Amino acid sequence: VVEAIGQERLERVRLQTPKGIIEIECDRLACGFGLVPNTQLGQLMGCQIKDNAITVDDYQCTSQPQVWAAGECTGFGGSELAMVEGSIAGYAAIGQNEKARQLFAQRQRYRLFAHLLEKSFNLRAELKTLARPETIFCRCEDVTFDKVAKRSSWIDAKLHTRCGMGACQGSTCATAAACLFDWQLPNSRPPLLPTRVKSLMAMSTSPLNQK
């Protein structure tokens, strides 16, 4: 998909094909530009991150002692792989390493699918050239691509354009910035998600805090 076109609503899309660019009339368009694991909690706990995923050993243990990770945060591989990783992490956490090892072969089989998934969703280089100067880069704050492209880093972009300062706190545009400009992703800070003041106030009166 090269461009979505319309007034008030989507009317047609422009596609790049081996025979050239064509236009197709349509009412809806769904695009997928890769899958990005959510590693914020791991980052906050000081776990090592590599290739946008929490690194783990054979027993799903992270770089932090007594912290195990499984599933999406260690890299996308499908629900079956996530379930097996969770079982291995659970057994390892309670010291049942022998039972954990019995699942290693099953995990390896599902990892073959994960490798194919990664290959299928790996972004092609030409996608980095799709954005135009007027392309909306940060939808929360209506910041265009040209304004962000002039900055030298993620922090610089936030300070001068308000990119990533909206409701999602950069959960979408920060990853795009890392991909397009090779910027380092921002460090996670609590709260990880937008939180109501009412919820924060309730924490101080929680029964758990009163014990």
PLM feature spans:
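Dinucleotide-binding/catalytic capping subdomain of oxidoreductase cores
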Residues: V1-I5, L15-Q16, V56-D57, Q106, ...
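Conserved beta-strand-loop-beta-strand element in the redox core of flavoprotein oxidoreductases
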Residues: A4-E23, L29
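Conserved active-site and cofactor/substrate-binding residues in soluble primary-metabolism enzymes
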Residues: I5-E8, I24, F33-V36, Q40, ...
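FAD-site-proximal beta/loop scaffold in flavoenzymes
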Residues: R28-E80, L103-Q106, L112
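Glycine-rich phosphate/pyrophosphate-binding beta-alpha loops
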Residues: E72-S79, R162-G170
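Mid-to-C-terminal Rossmann-like scaffold of FAD/NAD(P)H-dependent oxidoreductases
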Residues: L81-V84, I88-D156, G164, P186-S188, ...
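Short cysteine clusters
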Residues: C138-C140, C168, C173
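Alpha-helical interaction/regulatory segments in DNA maintenance proteins
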Residues: G170-W183
